[in-house]
Amino acid sequence: MTAPSPDKKPTATSQRRRSYNTGITADAVLTVALGLSREHGVEGWSLRQLLGELDTSFSVVYRLVGDRDALSAAVVDRAISAVSVPSAERDWRQWLTHLLVQMREALVECPGAAQWLLMNGVATERSRELMEAGLASLTDAGFGAEAAQAYTVAFTSTTTLIAMHDARRIPSGEPSPDHGAMLDQLSKDGPTDPRSSMEALIGKFAGPPDTAEATRAEHYRYTLDRVLDGLEARLDAIKESRK
């Protein structure tokens, strides 16, 4: 198969014969691509940047990994490769908690990976492995035919929080309201008791980086716990219906 050419018009300089680094490996390509993704987002860097970092040609990268879409998939897979499958000895709730807390730790280090997973589903080897293990845990717990829905609800509810934060920190050229702007808007009409509670929460998100990150982690865990509360209630109903 012939590699498609990068989106670049040939020039006299580019047509001159030059020596490229052809001895690189797929692992080296992904290491550089992951580094670019952590800095610019999974979709925020160009092939030209990657080729410049590697000092190689697109045909070499294409042969080793594939096109730009394949590179994105491989980067996301590499980003979540450290997420381990929890012990089967844990009950389903502990199992999902352990998995999804690990998932957050991995995804926040690679902006754009959360959105990629939400849009592409289990399109990488590691995401499929984790999903299959999750379905096994939920099936064993008694969710039966609803195991896939239960896993999807837990995964998407939490991963969306990461994707929302990524949307604010990855430059897109489009205006994106930050929490400071939200806080200003909420305060315009003067506080009331319910609204002041929301102001306090948004104020933490809008605080210094360490405070904001701690708040995001706490909010993620709160969301996860409440989703699992709902799934636990549903599991009780499923078991009751089988009596």
Regions found by a protein language model. Name each.
Residues 1-49, 65-73:
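Basic, helix-initiating cap at the start of DNA-binding domains
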Residues 27-35, 39, 53, 63, ...:
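Alpha-helical structural segments
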Residues 76, 104-133, 163-167, 171, ...:
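Amphipathic alpha-helical segments used for helix-helix packing
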Residues 48, 59-60:
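Key DNA-contact positions within bacterial/archaeal DNA-binding proteins
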Residues 84-129, 145, 151-154:
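Hydrophobic alpha-helical connector segments
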Residues 130-186, 232-234:
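Hydrophobic alpha-helical bundle segments that form small-molecule/ligand-binding pockets
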Residues 1-24, 84, 195-207, 239-243:
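N-terminal intrinsically disordered/low-complexity leader segments
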Residues 177-243:
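A structured, mid-to-C-terminal "fold-capping" secondary-structure block
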